[in-house]
Amino acid sequence: MEYEFRRNGLDGSVMARFSMEHEVMGRWFGEELGDKPAATAAVLTAIAAIQAGELREWRLTGREFSLELDEEQARVYANVLGYDNQDELDDGMSLYDAELEASCGLEDLEAALQSWQAFLVETR
């Protein structure tokens, strides 16, 4: 899983870009975690608890995207995927799930979060 982090020099906003199959993770990092070290720390704490066997799973529901963790993987998905009545959507308006969800190993997410944490500190 490849990624790159950037900070806008004009307004200070942060963004993340992930490899094609993990694009939604970049949006989750930028939009849900953003420049909030406490949010990143909370997810890292949950990962540590899962790895220590203290938790079996953990979920964080955000405004646009949610994160689910279990003992093996992390899954980020757009909350719009909870839309149950796909029949009401026109053919051209169907939701393209592949761009709206991605999974990776728990250790991969942990490494990306640690890099994000370091990026936030280094670019302040």
Swiss-Prot record:
Signal peptide boundaries: none
Q: Name one Pfam family in it.
A: UPF0231
InterPro entries referenced in this protein's UniProt entry, alphabetically: UPF0231
State the family it belongs to.
Answer: Belongs to the UPF0231 family.
Q: Which HAMAP family match?
A: UPF0231
The protein's name in its UniProt record: UPF0231 protein Sama_0645
* Species whose genome carries this gene: Shewanella amazonensis (strain ATCC BAA-1098 / SB2B)
